[in-house]
């Protein structure tokens, strides 16, 4: 109560922030006439002026009013769009590193230009993050004329783009791309073996569009670059036959072999189930008599069994995945989009492939990974935009330290949100949905129907076909057409069925999107200019009549066929209607067979239903029920937040380790001279080895000199008779032996360096170090995965799993670091080097970020001969000279990172340029 009184007196935090921003808006508006009076050249010159002022010590905040005024005027001249006052507020919110919640249709894409322009002036690069390649290309294409007018360059990162093009895109002042592309490029940059192969600059400032979708919905899914591991494909096929023989329990305490926890999305095998599974596997010959699934030798069998059970019990066709071109393609549960190239980890994808009888591809081994939570926290400044952030404001603040500011609409919202209608069965619910659609269609009111799965969208489509109602279906299977379908969803009587409207990125304009239609006419090369103008004029006249008719019919009507787990997703669907003060309406139709009600609100809601006891086909509308459902949604949101927070807490451990490894790797990559580091590593390794067999403060009887000599000979090719040293000098101790051994190793190493040359040795050292780090890090990631999967069992021993994970992960990391140093020292001191021995080992090209990536070269390949001769022979059979001198003589200019003119497809520096 006191809080409410304080808010009435002082206003909420949001009100106070808006009040401050409005003062800046007044200053920007005061500059408008001055900017309008400038010529194009004078307006463009402002960018250079701002950059100079920043170089002279002014801050971005200091030039904000002028920069925003310049951007607004440039937008009016180039795009024909002038920023509203509320859009100026949105721009300031983004610049301040906060989240701007703006309703659909309020022009978020235009809002971003203000903060992007201002921050790009600093010359450190700005990233604009979208949810898919289409939106990245579209938004960049729309805004590029504005940025180019202001003297700034624009780049776009899309999947399948080559590294050289990526470097150019990142070098631009402003770079558009998807969250996946930015994240995977960061990981790939930390796998290169040549610093010039890196594509990203420093992570300076990012504006994330649909920030809730990216930072919350996708936060539980880490980005993983993986290579194919050795795996027994046949085992997946065999294990796929086991689940049908096991009995599913109806309840957690019921009889059977396994229990499916739909809330936690897990399968739990009972004691009886373990015994039954062991019997089946023994009969199949996979398990020895009286052997246990829990024995160390059978961990892989248990892993495959649980993957098969999850595939059969939790993952359903046309809901969690579809089969396309003989492959299992994951469906994004939040947006309904196909996630081509993505694969589930831990053998689950292979288990689903076995279940559906498609080709089983090998399991992946993690080479590098990071969560979106930790990736986006690497930016110096982060901000975001969305239509629905307020329900997740606490999570944004606690995880990302991002405050949410609700931006007022330019015009008041006129949409009517009707109470939910709740039915006994799904059949009754869908009958009511079709009836509502039919009534809207008769009066010419466009309808958007939102479903939570492909299965339901196809069911609604089937019912509409039976009713003879023309409609469009927008789901993951129709990905290519979605922008066009959404653009025309506001036409008179249009019926659009959408899997999920989250992240669709295209406004629904009442009367249809005229721009899409006129653009199509302008792009039609079969029409003359006169014909194009005539058709566009006719379209514009017809559009106004359609627009007025839709307005009279009540605007866009939204129908939700199910409540989503998150209120935010429901609000996104509702928010498609009522843009820019347009009329509209929304209603959700629910049944007690819906997953949300069945799992989280069943008991009390069913009691209410029994009291009201309506006839078949009669809906219940009650505030108590609506509150009950919202309570269930809050419960799910809280559970999902806890899960995301838990993922972050565990990943934070790996993240600190990742930072250390990547920092060390970067230092090696960029240092011209790493001889001091190498000397330190050799000294540490020899000291540790001596301490192992001659422990400090120990008696001579406890020393194991023969084993020490054998290890030195085997690991370092160092044949020293330490026992004779001890006999010759009774006063000698462990420290003296360390010094002698280090001196011998350093002398031999100096001789090797002199033989091949200092620079050649430095290149060789650098590549060996990078490859050892990568190989050891890869093994460490696998070990961390295994630790993470089993750590929850520590709770049975009354131990805190998180604390145990941190403790063991720290020990494992110490072992990793010691192992890296040992392998580097061992390889570099024991390898036999001939004169002019080594061609620099280049990084293996990594494929599409969403496909299975090639593994890094192994150590045998690293220490082997250069493959350049093979490339030359294959792509240059006639022996043409492609050396720099020969190319220059022929007038050809080929840079190091350009494709080699021999046609091999490799970079010049990796092919014939290497020979030079």
From Swiss-Prot:
CDD domains: DEXDc_SecA (cd17928), SF2_C_secA (cd18803). It is found in: Cell inner membrane; Cytoplasm. Its EC number is 7.4.2.8. One of its GO terms (cellular component) is plasma membrane. It is an enzyme of class 7 (translocase). InterPro entries: Helicase_ATP-bd, Helicase_C-like, P-loop_NTPase, SEC_C_motif, SecA, SecA_CS, SecA_DEAD, SecA_motor_DEAD. Coiled coil: none annotated. Its cofactor is Zn(2+). The keyword Translocase applies. It is a peripheral membrane protein. The keyword Transferase does not apply. It catalyses: ATP + H2O + cellular proteinSide 1 = ADP + phosphate + cellular proteinSide 2. One of its GO terms (molecular function) is protein-exporting ATPase activity. Zn(2+) binds at residues 900, 902, 911-912. ATP binds at residues 87, 105-109, 507. SUPFAM superfamilies: Helical scaffold and wing domains of SecA, P-loop containing nucleoside triphosphate hydrolases, Pre-protein crosslinking domain of SecA. Keywords: ATP-binding, Cell inner membrane, Cell membrane, Cytoplasm, Membrane, Metal-binding, Nucleotide-binding, Protein transport, Translocase, Translocation, Transport, Zinc. Transmembrane segments: none annotated. One of its GO terms (biological process) is protein transport by the Sec complex. Part of the Sec protein translocase complex. Interacts with the SecYEG preprotein conducting channel. Has a central role in coupling the hydrolysis of ATP to the transfer of proteins into and across the cell membrane, serving both as a receptor for the preprotein-SecB complex and as an ATP-driven molecular motor driving the stepwise translocation of polypeptide chains across the membrane. Monomer and homodimer. Part of the essential Sec protein translocation apparatus which comprises SecA, SecYEG and auxiliary proteins SecDF-YajC and YidC. Belongs to the SecA family. This is Protein translocase subunit SecA. It comes from Neisseria meningitidis serogroup C / serotype 2a (strain ATCC 700532 / DSM 15464 / FAM18). The lineage of its organism: Bacteria, Pseudomonadati, Pseudomonadota, Betaproteobacteria, Neisseriales.
